[in-house]
């Protein structure tokens, strides 16, 4: 499956956090793995971008090229690392969820606007809700 973390999304947020899968893939399976096969960086990026977009019917995303919609993470690959998981209580009625932060993400851009910079929200909210497949 190209979309590892879409199964059961949110159903068990108090006991696991699969949002860490992309960071784990890049930091361990691409960069740090000592035994067994390492993934090529290009392969991992393709799995997390183009393959995932196609899997969910988003033909207008997944690559950085003219005419395509693209959000982008700028990553300091050498500093990329997961932080220790923690339980936080920020859901309605004080509900708990597992949270796992990461270091090494320099910036995240959505629709050309920086929404995260060095792990901090900028307050920008340029994204939009999309429904169903999107043609290129």
Question: Which role does the model predict for each range below?
Answer:
Residues 22-26, 91-96, 127-129, 135-136:
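Short, low-complexity, polar/charged sequence segments that are solvent-exposed and flexible
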Residues 2, 7, 74-120, 124-126:
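C-terminal cap of metal-dependent C-N hydrolases
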Residues 31, 134-135:
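Generic surface-pattern signal
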Residues 103, 133-134:
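Compact recognition or signaling/catalytic modules
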Residues 1-79:
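His/Asp/Glu-enriched, well-ordered alpha-helical/loop segment
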Residues 62-63, 70, 85, 91, ...:
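Residue-level signal for alpha-helical context at structural boundaries
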């Amino acid at each position: 499956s190209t979309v590892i973390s879409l199964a059961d999304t949110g159903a068990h947020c108090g006991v696991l956090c699969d949002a860490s899968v992309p960071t784990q893939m890049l930091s361990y399976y691409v960069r740090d793995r000592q035994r067994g096969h390492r993934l090529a960086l290009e392969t991992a990026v393709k799995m997390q971008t183009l393959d995932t977009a196609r899997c969910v019917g988003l033909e207008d995303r997944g690559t950085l090229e003219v005419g395509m919609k693209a959000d982008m993470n700028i990553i300091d690959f050498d500093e990329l690392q997961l932080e220790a998981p923690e339980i936080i209580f920020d859901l309605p009625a004080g509900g708990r969820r597992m949270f796992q932060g990461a270091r090494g993400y320099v910036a995240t851009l959505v629709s050309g606007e920086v929404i995260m910079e060095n792990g901090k929200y900028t307050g920008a909210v340029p994204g939009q809700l999309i429904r169903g497949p999107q043609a290129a």
